Design a protein with these regions (language model features):
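Active-site-proximal alpha-helical scaffold in enzymes
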Residues: 103-132, 170, 278-299
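Short glycine-enriched loops at secondary-structure junctions
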Residues: 19, 78-84, 135-136, 175, ...
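Conserved beta-ketoacyl condensing-enzyme motif
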Residues: 13, 48-106, 221-237, 242
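Short beta-strand segments
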Residues: 14, 78-79, 129-135, 303-308
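Short acidic, glycine/serine/threonine-rich loops at helix termini
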Residues: 24-26, 87-89, 140-146, 237-239, ...
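Condensing-enzyme catalytic core mediating Claisen C-C bond formation in acyl metabolism
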Residues: 1-48, 147-217, 252-263, 269-272, ...
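Short, well-ordered, mixed-charge alpha-helical segments that flank or form enzyme active sites
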Residues: 85-86, 137-142, 187-192, 235, ...
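Short, well-ordered amphipathic alpha-helical segments that serve as non-catalytic structural scaffolds
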Residues: 51-67, 115, 202-217, 286-293
Length: 337
């Protein structure tokens, strides 16, 4: 049975920052990023190390913006798309803070917010922690698809893995106007898709399942935005069809509230990103660069975030397995007066 956790005492998002690469800087949200690099290397020699450096820079910026030192962090939870989360561990070990590595594919941002919120809520030991998520286009292409030098043609349904990182400082204390008030882990759902270049379609069913479950207990009229992670053009269309098939008026209402980080991060009419943005850095960077500032000022008062993940690896794809989707969610609210 899937259960929603409603926090009696909210967890506050005290600080946040976003770091991105060349395509992210050229997109419509580029001006909202704290730092971007036209070379996508961030001073490193390899793209894999560059992803770790993005995580380090994002967390460092989030701390500096709030004048917090790393010694004031009790825990870091972080994840990325590289095997064994080496980008996160390699980029964040210098902070000298206890570390939990997470892997939820492109759902890692929301997964991290859930894990850290739960630990802060239930523990007397932890009072403040950081959640960091990253992905790098070139590192992901090399690991999951083909070497960059090969120049393989991409399918129209494929997404563009974001070169981006988002960092969030969470606290038990009321240190900001941004609150996490509820969360729900996702279920692994068979998307009945085997094509790794059509992950938006593979994840759409899990997004529908989480949204449908959540709104059995909650009123959509109280929300300003339902934000999925990286369904892109294809997955978003499927999600809206699924919602309408369930209940036409209900689906129409939710469709008016829905947007997708993969559609916000890039200008699909001008940038060659095919179906839109993807990667766990996609939802993390859109949340930290564009959404949270609006929540902090009260422009957005209640947002439902579902970072959508496609659970697969190169072996499962080569063996013809179905891609499972997962969509954990968190509710972020304005806590001002």
């Amino acid at each position: 049975m899937q259960k929603i956790t409603y926090l009696e005492s909210p967890i506050f998002i005290e600080g946040y920052s976003a770091v991105g690469g060349r395509e992210e800087a050229r997109g419509p949200l580029g001006k909202y990023f704290d730092l971007t690099d036209e070379k996508d290397l961030f001073g490193m020699k390899t793209y894999e190390r560059a992803e770790g450096e993005m995580s380090r820079l994002a967390l460092n910026l989030a701390l500096k913006k709030r004048k917090i030192t790393e010694k004031e962090l009790d825990l870091i939870v972080a994840g990325d798309l590289q095997n064994q989360c080496v980008a996160s561990s390699g980029g964040l070990f210098t902070f000298g803070v206890p570390f939990l590595g997470l892997y939820g594919a492109c759902s890692t941002c929301t997964e991290g917010l859930i894990v850290l919120s739960a630990m802060l809520t239930s523990s007397r030991t932890y009072k403040r922690g950081a959640c960091v998520t990253s992905s790098h286009n070139c590192a992901a292409e090399r690991q999951f698809r083909t070497p960059l030098e090969y120049g393989a043609q991409r399918s129209p349904t494929s997404g563009w893995t974001a070169t981006a990182s988002g960092a969030f400082i969470l606290s038990k204390e009321r240190t900001s106007n941004i609150m996490i008030t509820s969360f729900m882990p996702g279920k692994a759902i068979d998307g009945y898709i085997k094509d790794a270049s059509n992950m938006g379609a593979a994840m759409a069913l899990s997004a529908f399942d989480s949204i449908d479950t959540f709104f059995k207990e909650n009123d959509p009229d109280t929300f300003d935005l339902i934000l999925t992670g990286d369904l892109g053009r294809v997955g978003s269309a499927i999600l809206r069809d699924l919602l309408s098939e369930k209940n036409e008026s209900f689906g129409r209402k939710l469709s008016t509230l829905h947007n997708d980080c993969g559609l916000l991060l890039y200008d699909l009419s001008k940038q060659d990103v095919h179906a839109g943005g993807s990667g766990c850095g996609c939802s993390a960077s859109v949340l930290s660069s564009f959404i949270l500032p609006k929540v902090e000022t009260g422009e957005l008062r209640k947002v439902l975030l579902l970072s959508t993940g496609a659970l697969m690896n190169t072996s499962s794809i080569c063996q013809g397995d179905h891609i499972l989707g997962i969509s954990p969610l968190v509710t972020v609210e304005y806590g001002g007066t």
